[in-house]
Amino acid sequence: IPYNPQSQGVVESMNKELKKIIGQVRDQAEHLKTAVQMAVFIHNFKRKGGIGGYSAGERIIDIIATDIQTKELQKQITKIQNFRVYYRDSRDPIWKGPAKLLWKGEGAVVIQDNSDIKVVPRRKVKIIRDYGKQMAGDDCVASRQDED
């Protein structure tokens, strides 16, 4: 282990804190091993303070939960990026679009049409997968003629 005086101070501070907690809980535990486990638990989950008033254990759990939520949201975003939306406004029978799908919920979708962001009921929306330019009509016709 490389010499690092700052980390040595952190370790010494933690040892001092754990010794203090062990002194408080020693009479409640039959074995020293149990007292050490109790002290570590108390230090990680019961002592609040620092960032946001969380305990150390709550902070790490919050970090992990946030990371999982971020990954799930990124998955959902990549799923709906390739969709185009055609929609109708109120009583106007003419379909408008294509607009970019931002969010798809149970009863409504959020779309971006030019710079406008709108919430439209699902019943007034047609969601179509955008296959990109490789499926454009002229290219398909040309490739089919080449196959014959």
Swiss-Prot record:
Residues that, per the record, bind Mg(2+): E12
DNA-binding region: 83-130
InterPro entries: Integrase_C_dom_sf_retrovir, Integrase_C_retrovir, Integrase_cat-core, RNaseH-like_sf, RNaseH_sf
PROSITE patterns: INTEGRASE, INTEGRASE_DBD
Record EC number: 2.7.7.-, 3.1.-.-
Gene Ontology process terms (BP): DNA integration; DNA recombination; establishment of integrated proviral latency; symbiont entry into host cell; symbiont-mediated suppression of host gene expression; viral genome integration into host DNA
Pfam families: IN_DBD_C
Swiss-Prot/TrEMBL keywords: AIDS, DNA integration, DNA recombination, DNA-binding, Endonuclease, Eukaryotic host gene expression shutoff by virus, Eukaryotic host translation shutoff by virus, Host gene expression shutoff by virus, Host-virus interaction, Hydrolase, Lipid-binding, Magnesium, Metal-binding, Nuclease, Nucleotidyltransferase, Transferase, Viral genome integration, Virus entry into host cell
MF terms in GO: DNA binding; endonuclease activity; lipid binding; metal ion binding; nucleotidyltransferase activity
Protein name: Gag-Pol polyprotein
Annotated organism of origin: Human immunodeficiency virus type 1 group M subtype D (isolate Z6) (HIV-1)
Lineage: Viruses, Riboviria, Pararnavirae, Artverviricota, Revtraviricetes
GN (gene name): gag-pol
